């Protein structure tokens, strides 16, 4: 009958236990943030390519893009949230736009919400042509983001398992 002998089995079990305890904080978190950084950088690059238009759009003649101040505000407020666990037990970060720009009006006394401006650019409106910068960026770098996440996760696992 064949037998199997494990040498240093207890040491290996301790490493696996430590990996289990530290997996979320030291492996998953950095890996998810590395992937999100790749995507956020791609969104920023695509946003810089969006044309600006200082005119007023109509349904017959929509503007081709946002005003320069709107675009600058979006570039300045693009960010990544901290990692959170959702109801299904999945860990996520969100990439998005925060705050308000400097274009004030009766409707927006604080300034226009940057999330609203980004959505208007991405989807278009009756007075602005759509410029798909988020969807385009995400589809272009999806594989790169996954590769960055895998590389970071493997590196962190190797550090813990040493």
Task: Spell out what each predicted region is.
Residues 1-25:
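N-terminal, Lys/Arg- and Ser/Thr-rich interaction peptides
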Residues 25-123, 155, 161-162:
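Short, low-complexity, charged/polar segments at coil/turn and helix-coil boundaries
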Residues 11-15, 23, 73, 116, ...:
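Exposed alpha-helical structural elements
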Residues 112-162:
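Lipid-handling modules and contact-site tethers
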